[in-house]
């Protein structure tokens, strides 16, 4: 597994010197009073050296040294704005509206891109024209910026996602084509405080399969300002409501099966012993289920990027 990742990173360094025309990537960082980690976030982007990048930082009216940090990197980013907004997703909508890149993604102000992450993204979308959105290996980063956990490569399916398996798509590692963004409505919902990414993924799944990439792209930083246990409970509850509404859009046997499965999951949740058995048997079974929308994994081999079916 490690050898695959190392070969991928090396190949991107070679590609960087090859004169290849890279797709334009539009990346946005929303921030509010982010002085502790923002500089590391910006550096993880600009130090990539990706040659066709639109990078916008959107500040929500910070009162600490955030603006000073942004100004320090004015010459290395595409632009920035500072004004009050209606939450993170409103800030992201403002940022994306100022970009034209054909590939899109965002990076929160405490998180990091992995080395050559943008070259990985650009080369995949350039090589695999049928792929519309991707996510890298789920990765956790310590408060000091060290990668501390790299999870196995999940395979994604809309059916399993709506059933409750594979719930957490790591946003820091997720990128998509602008055409998919536009088909899905062209904006993030500002109705939510923390669940707007989940709601966007639900809309993306209506139009395209999500492909995992067996490579490191970005990482989520664990720190004191991350979601607390109580906030996580609210996040899960709101995501469950979003998924339930999406299931209602379906028809026939698929809708009936998903509703029954979700009902059973809720019914056993208050019973610890039964819940444990359900999670071991039913939920693990979902992870291994090959649905019709089960997406191949993207891997790098001797001849470049390929889909492993």
Range-by-range predicted roles:
Residues 1-47:
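N-proximal low-complexity "stem/linker" segments adjacent to membrane-targeting elements
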Residues 27, 97, 150-239:
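Conserved nucleotide-sugar donor-binding catalytic segment
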Residues 51, 59-68, 108:
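A conserved acidic beta->alpha catalytic loop
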Residues 36-39, 64-72, 116:
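Acidic helix N-cap motif at the loop->helix transition within catalytic regions
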Residues 104:
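Short aromatic/hydrophobic "clamp" motif used to bind/position activated sugar donors
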Residues 1-6, 244-309:
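Membrane-proximal basic amphipathic "stem/tether" segments
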Residues 82-99:
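Glycine-rich, basic loop-to-helix element that forms the pyrophosphate-binding segment
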């Amino acid at each position: 597994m490690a050898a695959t990742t190392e070969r991928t990173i090396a190949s991107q360094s070679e590609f960087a010197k090859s004169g290849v025309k890279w797709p334009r990537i539009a990346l946005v960082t929303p921030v509010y009073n982010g002085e502790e980690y923002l500089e590391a976030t910006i550096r993880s982007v600009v130090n990539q050296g990706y040659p066709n990048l639109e990078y916008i930082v959107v500040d929500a009216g910070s009162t600490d040294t955030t603006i000073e940090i942004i100004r320090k990197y004015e010459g290395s980013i595409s632009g920035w704005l500072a004004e009050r907004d209606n939450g993170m997703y409103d800030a992201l909508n403002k940022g994306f509206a100022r970009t034209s890149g054909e590939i899109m993604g965002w990076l929160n102000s405490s998180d990091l891109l992995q080395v050559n992450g943008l070259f990985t993204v650009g080369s995949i979308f350039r090589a695999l024209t049928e792929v519309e959105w991707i996510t890298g290996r789920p990765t956790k980063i310590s408060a000091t910026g060290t990668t501390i956990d790299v999870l196995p490569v999940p395979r994604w399916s809309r059916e399993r996602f709506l059933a409750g398996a594979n719930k957490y798509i790591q946003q820091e590692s997720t990128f998509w084509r602008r055409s998919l963004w536009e088909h899905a409505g062209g904006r993030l919902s500002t109705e939510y405080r923390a669940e707007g990414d989940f709601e966007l993924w639900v809309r993306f799944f209506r139009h395209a399969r999500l492909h995992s990439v067996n490579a490191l792209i970005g990482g989520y930083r664990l720190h004191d300002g991350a979601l607390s246990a109580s906030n996580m409970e609210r996040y899960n509850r709101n995501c469950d409501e979003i998924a339930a509404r999406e299931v209602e859009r379906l028809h026939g046997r698929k809708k009936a099966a998903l509703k029954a499965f979700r009902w059973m999951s809720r019914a056993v949740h208050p019973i610890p012993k039964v819940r444990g058995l359900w999670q071991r048997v039913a939920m693990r079974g979902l992870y291994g289920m090959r649905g019709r929308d089960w997406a191949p994994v993207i891997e790098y081999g001797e001849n470049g990027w390929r889909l492993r079916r």
